[in-house]
Amino acid sequence: CFEPEHVCLDNEIHVLAGGRLREECALLMQHSRIKPGQARITAGHHLPAKHVIHALAPKVTGEPTLELQQQLATCYEATLTLALENDLHSIAFCSLGTGHKNFPSPLAAQIALDITESFHAKHPEIKIIFCPYKDIDHNLYHYLLNN
């Protein structure tokens, strides 16, 4: 997020990581802008994480179409592929698309769990963590993971 003081997870990550993350993202964007469903990896800079994987969730206006659902699934797949390609041992996900992209939380959570469960069955060496930004998403993931 390049809007100063905008309240969103993306902006908070950039603030905590420091100015170098914004610079690295700006350089990436100069070479090629990502499309919904794609992901890119950068250094973590001042974050405790060594890397940040940036995924672009689709914007939902109205009902989420099958195409938008597939784009969200592809976000998770692309992110997990980057984690694997970069030999990462763990990855933490917020609830992609449920903020200002307006993806309905229950559907987004189910897509996330379907994709990550399938991936984890093939690659159990990578620890997958969910840390949703909003309380409603946190409660939803807690419920779905325990039932």
Label for each model-derived stretch:
Residues 1-85:
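Glycine-/small-residue-enriched capping loops at alpha/beta junctions
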Residues 59-147:
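Phosphate/ribose-phosphate-bearing ligand recognition and processing surfaces
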